[in-house]
């Protein structure tokens, strides 16, 4: 070390200054390297002996952050996306309201209601179903193509006084629509609205209100006789079904292949949505920072619809 200092003090003043500058630079570099090495070693030890290191799923993280919860048992039997048939009976507990009592039921310019309810006053539907239907009927009546038509007739819905009805109508999600062909002559004649030009607007726009034509005549299950049955599923689901020209059952099959990190993504009149499926034995993953809705599928699984544009 003594020799080092002697070397630094030898030579002219200018030579000594240059030697000292080089020496200081070497010392500073060595100290910096030692500090960096220490930080690296400490970080490695923390990680090795219990330090937490989160590894978010990149695909999932690019869409929405998630967390987990435990769904209530009744949620698997409720919602707008239940499979309903003879093998999958309705077991839900959704509130059914009388259609006649809906406060937002639209009226014509002259005062009467835009549509008529079937022969019994006890036809009902879920709040979401009838609210969406009322908005659709108000817009239909106001559209130039309707000619201010007020002959629509809800021929069939959930009959709250009858136990002998199909699973579809018992759910309060389905409405069968007919119309008065000769309202002032014979009110008993009520054909299906299917195939009638002035009601084409309803078929073209129902998805914007959350409805699907339950049995399109073009599908395997379709028939002209049932082509006037509309089911409420919600705007994003109705939009996807309409755009992809598939049946409700085919949509449920498509959903079964989705996950929180690989959802269906769709842009609707109601905003951007992510939709994914959780199987019966799957972890209950939900968005952490976005609002969402849950529907059972009546097979034990759950369908989560995330509002991509709405944060909590």
Where are the regions that the model predicts?
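Extracytoplasmic cell-surface/polysaccharide-interacting catalytic and binding patches
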Residues: 4-32, 36-312
């Amino acid at each position: 070390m003594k020799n080092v200092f002697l070397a630094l003090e030898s030579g002219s003043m200018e030579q000594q200054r240059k030697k000292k500058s080089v020496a200081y630079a070497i010392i500073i570099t060595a100290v910096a390297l030692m500090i960096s090495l220490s930080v690296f070693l400490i970080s490695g030890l923390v990680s090795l002996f219990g330090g937490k290191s989160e590894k978010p799923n990149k695909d999932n993280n690019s869409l929405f952050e998630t967390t987990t919860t435990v769904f209530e048992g009744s949620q698997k039997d409720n919602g707008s996306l239940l499979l309903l048939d003879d093998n999958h009976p309705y077991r839900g507990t959704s509130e059914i309201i009388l259609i006649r009592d809906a406060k937002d039921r639209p009226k014509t310019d002259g005062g009467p209601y835009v549509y008529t309810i079937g022969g019994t006053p006890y036809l009902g539907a879920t709040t979401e179903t009838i609210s969406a239907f009322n908005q659709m009927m108000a817009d239909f009546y106001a559209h130039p193509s309707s000619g201010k038509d007020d002959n629509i007739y809800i021929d069939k819905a959930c009959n709250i006084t009858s136990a002998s009805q199909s699973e579809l109508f018992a759910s309060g999600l389905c409405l069968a629509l007919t119309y008065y062909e000769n309202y002032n002559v014979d009110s008993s004649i009520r054909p299906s609205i299917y195939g009638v030009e002035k009601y084409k607007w309803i078929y073209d726009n129902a998805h914007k209100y959350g409805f699907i034509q339950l049995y399109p005549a073009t599908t395997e299950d379709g028939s002209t006789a049932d082509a006037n049955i509309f089911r409420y599923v919600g705007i994003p689901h109705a939009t996807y079904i309409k755009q992809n020209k598939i049946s409700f059952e085919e949509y449920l099959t498509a959903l079964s292949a989705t996950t929180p990190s690989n959802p269906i993504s769709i842009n609707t009149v109601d905003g951007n949505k992510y939709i994914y499926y959780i199987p019966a034995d799957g972890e209950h993953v939900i968005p952490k920072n976005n609002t969402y809705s849950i529907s059972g599928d009546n097979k034990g699984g759950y369908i989560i619809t995330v509002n991509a544009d709405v944060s909590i």
